[in-house]
Amino acid sequence: KENADPQRTAFLLRKQWALYSVTPLYRFSNAHLRAYARLLSAFIAAEKQKGLAVEVGVELDIKVAVSSLPDLRGSEQDQAAILVQLSLRSSTSKKKSEEKLVWSGCFCCVFGDDLSEKIPQDFTCLPLFLTNGAESYTSIVGSWFQKTFDCSFRRLAISPLNLSWMAAMWTGCKVDKLTTATELVFSVSCLPQPLDISYAIHPEDAKALWDTVQKTPGEITQEEVDVFMDCLYSHFHRHFKIHLSATKLVKVSTAIASAHCDGIIKFLQSQYLTGVLMLLTELAISHIQ
């Protein structure tokens, strides 16, 4: 079910987002977002004074905006997503047009019933945190949230097993124009020099293969994912005599999204945004529990 308003969620598309899991926030309230923005702004200014996030040259102010995104959730049970944006503006300029967005962070929960049903009333469940921008800002914002809401953040890596699921799921999605190749990147670590192998598959061929493997449309099993990957491996071996099963899958790129094992994601299709976020919410929850 894709119910996110494309206009309200367009900011997520075609950018690289780093993924984190976040434990539930204690006594967080949607009614106090403006106060949170003020407090976070003061905290960043204090950290800047300590020299932790100094911009060289012009004296720059950091403007903090904290807003709610009710469109970005899977069901009524989910907490509305929270967007934190940091913009830089020269302290000599008062024009809004001269503000430059330098960092965004989005807390969200898409079909996170597994966790939200189990947590006490004073806690807010937003287990997935996406960031775009300098890590120095991520760490300052993260430490303010940790101090204020007694939560903890961890980088969310994506295992080769989960990447293979993404490859299969996204390959099977219907897209108006199949122009983007499905690309899998494998890492060979046993060599003196690390080597990456890129395996590009024509999107129509990849979809045709998945359609022969998938037994029940709309449902995916581990066995189907294994068969899909094995078919790709044996095809590659036939042509290049390389056993991809002995390497590590590190990146998947499709028309829907691309994902890297280090926990980096890029969303490419607004119509599948909710579906991808649902999968990432599930990974974040399993990371916390």
Please give the residue ranges for each predicted region.
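Core residues of folded domains in eukaryotic genome-function proteins
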Residues: 58-62, 78-84, 103-104, 124-129, ...
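Internal, hydrophobic cores of structured domains that mediate oligomerization or house catalytic pockets
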Residues: 88-170
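Amphipathic alpha-helical protein-protein interaction segments
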Residues: 124, 130, 134-135, 199, ...
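Terminal interaction module
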Residues: 150-251
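Charged, low-complexity surface segments at secondary-structure and domain boundaries
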Residues: 17-30, 126, 149-151, 213-216
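C-terminal, charged interaction/regulatory segments at domain termini
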Residues: 225-289
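N-terminal low-complexity/intrinsically disordered pre-sequences and tails
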Residues: 1-117, 264-289
